[in-house]
Amino acid sequence: MSRLLWRKVAGATVGPGPVPAPGRWVSSSVPASDPSDGQRRRQQQQQQQQQQQQQPQQPQVLSSEGGQLRHNPLDIQMLSRGLHEQIFGQGGEMPGEAAVRRSVEHLQKHGLWGQPAVPLPDVELRLPPLYGDNLDQHFRLLAQKQSLPYLEAANLLLQAQLPPKPPAWAWAEGWTRYGPEGEAVPVAIPEERALVFDVEVCLAEGTCPTLAVAISPSAWYSWCSQRLVEERYSWTSQLSPADLIPLEVPTGASSPTQRDWQEQLVVGHNVSFDRAHIREQYLIQGSRMRFLDTMSMHMAISGLSSFQRSLWIAAKQGKHKVQPPTKQGQKSQRKARRGPAISSWDWLDISSVNSLAEVHRLYVGGPPLEKEPRELFVKGTMKDIRENFQDLMQYCAQDVWATHEVFQQQLPLFLERCPHPVTLAGMLEMGVSYLPVNQNWERYLAEAQGTYEELQREMKKSLMDLANDACQLLSGERYKEDPWLWDLEWDLQEFKQKKAKKVKKEPATASKLPIEGAGAPGDPMDQEDLGPCSEEEEFQQDVMARACLQKLKGTTELLPKRPQHLPGHPGWYRKLCPRLDDPAWTPGPSLLSLQMRVTPKLMALTWDGFPLHYSERHGWGYLVPGRRDNLAKLPTGTTLESAGVVCPYRAIESLYRKHCLEQGKQQLMPQEAGLAEEFLLTDNSAIWQTVEELDYLEVEAEAKMENLRAAVPGQPLALTARGGPKDTQPSYHHGNGPYNDVDIPGCWFFKLPHKDGNSCNVGSPFAKDFLPKMEDGTLQAGPGGASGPRALEINKMISFWRNAHKRISSQMVVWLPRSALPRAVIRHPDYDEEGLYGAILPQVVTAGTITRRAVEPTWLTASNARPDRVGSELKAMVQAPPGYTLVGADVDSQELWIAAVLGDAHFAGMHGCTAFGWMTLQGRKSRGTDLHSKTATTVGISREHAKIFNYGRIYGAGQPFAERLLMQFNHRLTQQEAAEKAQQMYAATKGLRWYRLSDEGEWLVRELNLPVDRTEGGWISLQDLRKVQRETARKSQWKKWEVVAERAWKGGTESEMFNKLESIATSDIPRTPVLGCCISRALEPSAVQEEFMTSRVNWVVQSSAVDYLHLMLVAMKWLFEEFAIDGRFCISIHDEVRYLVREEDRYRAALALQITNLLTRCMFAYKLGLNDLPQSVAFFSAVDIDRCLRKEVTMDCKTPSNPTGMERRYGIPQGEALDIYQIIELTKGSLEKRSQPGP
């Protein structure tokens, strides 16, 4: 192959040759990732450690070796001398005096300089020998060694001339190999180093694989399941390894030892789905097979952001005309400052969505792939597949061929755009996620579903009781004074009967004459006890009873042919009750559910004390009393009582007054809501996706407004949400409204706030976005018994399981027979012969977003256990088998530190030299000097909410996002108040934008004699820039001038960090600073111009975090292999990693994790030109050693479906959380096996 797959590393051998012998290095010159940063530091003088007089004297704190603790000139405690010399070598550049002075002034300005610091004990640790001449070469050599066998296998596929497809496919169970002429030969497994592979599953029959096709450089292969070839009445739904596809070990053969596994590569499109159906992947000890996903490589090369994906689909369907906006639209966009109009569409031609058909069209071209046969696997039965076997095998083979063609084009591109070998090695390791489970998984599913159904029944009964109680308001028309039920259908259906036929009177016969002494029913004579009846009296009574029954039977002819449905009941109630002829008939309003519009009314829901109301046009909102302008609209002489159904506004006023009295104040004060689930900063936090969605909604809404203005020039827009004169707004309440087109006498209508903005309607107040509002009391069930509040509480409790149970219950669990379990499990005292031991392979897309973050719908988004959420103990059901433990840790403030170190390297080349960096390293929550506390104090919000805004800014969100979020967190804020708070926050953190004029701009200022104020560096403010642009445009007949040469943020705690992020995002080819990965071609400036800045700034931090993870995975694999630690990678959830480790190796694995974190952080510092690392971020605050997967080892995970907790119900005790000092004590600071204490 003409292209070298890996670029050569200076001073290191590359390829299959021997890896250089490990050894220490002495760092001399350290390459900087940014030439300007490196130049600035090389120009700084090398000065002595003692700095200017402003620096306070440090206490003489001794290290464990008896020396002084190491500090940098800004009083940040650094690595111990021993660790520093092992990693960075001796010596190194010291920051210049000017840089230190500039940093001190900056920290003084933000009130951080001179804050006391708590010293940490030094960590003295002998690291394993490192390879190469520096950290970068160390990681390069490790990654090359780990990925080289797979890269060689990939090379075989790249250079191969594939054999032709066989003319017919063998109808035979198991694997079949096809020769050059198409001859079919049964084989146990495909003995190949590299395969392109595709599995198809008949979904109607469950998750068992149905058929598969593979191709190697030399032959085609097909596989058929026993369930396809052999017809049976039924098959078991429980999967075992025998149902899966063998790729490494023939059926019936024993598993090889760890050393005997061969390195093999499988390539596929969304290959994690195919991996889930491979037998050997479920073994506890794992194999050496690795997987390359063409879908993930596409995302890294030419993937789309979520907003771009929407635009791409719209353009593909012809719903969006690809043309630049009008001048009027551009002007309005600039004026609104909500984000640019989409003016560059070049990216449409170099990107696509993720489907194989579209990816093939992008990279290969040619006729489109035929995808219609796929529907048979989705909707058809096994019989349909048997009848169309040859066609479906050809379809599967076509996908394999297309995947190979895509792979041939992608891999060279991927290696060019992600040149560091750590990226590929990390993705290969990410592709073998593994979650061990046992019989407790089945118990969890049953308990959660049972609890859910029980609560559902209780909620149904509560709702039915509410409906029955509401029906009683018909008496005396009391419903007319009910703030919720007044506008329901209260019309009654009268009881109808046919007219009686006229019959000719017959003369009374003896038998029809009244019997003497027999009274009518109910006659007092009947009640009198006359003693025992005579035989004659008994006979007479029997005759009379038969006559009455005969008469009653005759009235059936008067009933209508179609029986009436609940006559005498109001219309809304009748709709909730099934008809008598319904096969599923049950008594009462059993059709009632939370999805019905009548339910919030029956529950008497209030929003801040105002009753909820539904509008066909605006969705759910609430009624605010006090409006008087529409009371006069009634016809003259008509009273409210005679006007028909009229809103009981006086009752609503009384309701709100009562609410205010209960609150103990006349008017409600602002109160912060809890966090919606997608904004909780837990391991499933989706904030990095929400930022882009919310930020671009502003762009979309503004574009729609411009289209409306352009459609009718000079014509005012139609009535908006706040249409109407100002005096029709309440003075004591503000919110999303009033919407005066909802004309309800005596009341204003306000919409419930929607997370996507005021223009969106709320379809249900029971949506999960309103759960925090239920918890903080904003959304409440009204008075009148406990049924309403209880139903609301139950809705909150079952929300998680209702939304997730299908995904959870459909997880593919494979139970292992005893013969497939390792000896460490079988011989452990806790092994249960009757128990079940198996695994789930989470179908992780290793690079599922443009930031190359992994994506998976269940496990990577699972929330932590909550006491009021059924089934939320999900993650704790991942439980290590006997003899094994789960070892892992969370990277502390990963993205904050990455952003901070980028800013520090850019500003003065010292850790903690910016306010943002200092707060990340030295800030203390107890003193209010950490980042989140500072933001909370500045804006006057809670610390939890401040976290969201801080992460949002780092992910590229602008001020509109902050305004939206402020109003979502505190819906009682006005738009103006939210804008002021957001402006205050961004001015204090991000700073203000300043501009440096271009040569053309300077010439215009001189020629036009325009007065502008400049800072010391020649920067001008936004106001002066607008003045220059306005005057030059006016005096040159609106000619466009390029007056800006450079933009920069100034004056905020995070200004330098944002300047660095934006400089990377706007560079010609943005690359991550550490591993040098390119941004997607669909977001390169040459394709998008100035568009999609949110996504691009977000990419810098998030993609660097992925670099961090890949470095960790490579380092952990090295240490596990080097020191024979028996363990395997399990899963990475955002900034958390977990490994499955033999019990006896757990402490060595914990030490390996700590060393991995140290080397990874040092790699970041080294690549940014910083020859040191602060002690506070060098090690994990704690490494968790546990038997199950949970956020904290002390969490008992009590939930409604697990009320007694993990220890009592499942027998899982609390785990261990060990810091670096405890781990060193347990392991004696060594990774060698002899250092490991007993279990």
Swiss-Prot record:
Consequence of changing L966R? In MTDPS4A; likely pathogenic
Keywords for the protein's UniProt record, in alphabetical order: Disease variant, DNA replication, DNA-binding, DNA-directed DNA polymerase, Epilepsy, Hydrolase, Leigh syndrome, Lyase, Magnesium, Mitochondrion, Mitochondrion nucleoid, Neurodegeneration, Neuropathy, Nucleotidyltransferase, Primary mitochondrial disease, Progressive external ophthalmoplegia, Transferase
| Outcome when changing R853W | In PEOB1; with absence of progressive external ophthalmoplegia
Q: Residue numbers of motif Exo III? A: 395-403
UniProt cross-references to InterPro entries, sorted A to Z: DNA-dir_DNA_pol_A_CS (IPR019760), DNA-dir_DNA_pol_A_mt (IPR002297), DNA-dir_DNA_pol_A_palm_dom (IPR001098), DNA/RNA_pol_sf (IPR043502), DNApol_Exo (IPR041336), POLG_palm_dom (IPR047580), RNaseH-like_sf (IPR012337)
Q: Which cofactor(s) are needed, names only?
A: Mg(2+)
Show where the record puts the motif Pol C.
1134-1141
Where along the sequence does the record place the motif called Exo I? 196-200
Any coiled-coil ranges, and where?
none
Q: What is the effect of changing T251I?
A: In PEOB1, MTDPS4A and MTDPS4B
Stated consequence of mutating S1104C: In PEOB1; sporadic case
Q: Which residues bind Mg(2+) 2?
A: D890, V891, D1135
Q: What is the effect of changing R574W?
A: In PEOB1; sporadic case
The annotated consequence of D890N reads:
Abolishes DNA polymerase activity
**Compartments where located:** Mitochondrion; Mitochondrion matrix, Mitochondrion nucleoid
Motif (Pol B) positions are: 943-958
Identify the EC number(s): 2.7.7.7, 3.1.11.-, 4.2.99.-
Q: Which SUPFAM superfamilies match?
A: DNA/RNA polymerases (SSF56672), Ribonuclease H-like (SSF53098)
Q: Where is this site: Critical for replication fidelity and mismatch recognition?
A: R853, Q1102
Catalyses: DNA(n) + a 2'-deoxyribonucleoside 5'-triphosphate = DNA(n+1) + diphosphate; a 3'-end 2'-deoxyribonucleotidyl-deoxyribonucleotide-DNA + H2O = a 3'-end 2'-deoxyribonucleotide-DNA + a 2'-deoxyribonucleoside 5'-phosphate + H(+); a 5'-end 2'-deoxyribose-2'-deoxyribonucleotide-DNA = (2E,4S)-4-hydroxypenten-2-al-5-phosphate + a 5'-end 5'-phospho-2'-deoxyribonucleoside-DNA + H(+)
Accessory-interacting determinant: where is this region? 510-571
* Ranges where the record places region Trigger loop: 858-864
* Annotated family: Belongs to the DNA polymerase type-A family.
Q: Which disease is it linked to?
A: Progressive external ophthalmoplegia with mitochondrial DNA deletions, autosomal dominant, 1: A disorder characterized by progressive weakness of ocular muscles and levator muscle of the upper eyelid. In a minority of cases, it is associated with skeletal myopathy, which predominantly involves axial or proximal muscles and which causes abnormal fatigability and even permanent muscle weakness. Ragged-red fibers and atrophy are found on muscle biopsy. A large proportion of chronic ophthalmoplegias are associated with other symptoms, leading to a multisystemic pattern of this disease.
PANTHER family cross-referenced by the UniProt entry: DNA POLYMERASE SUBUNIT GAMMA-1 (PTHR10267:SF0)
Name the record gives this protein = DNA polymerase subunit gamma-1
Give the organism, scientific name.
Homo sapiens (Human)
This chain is encoded by the gene named: POLG
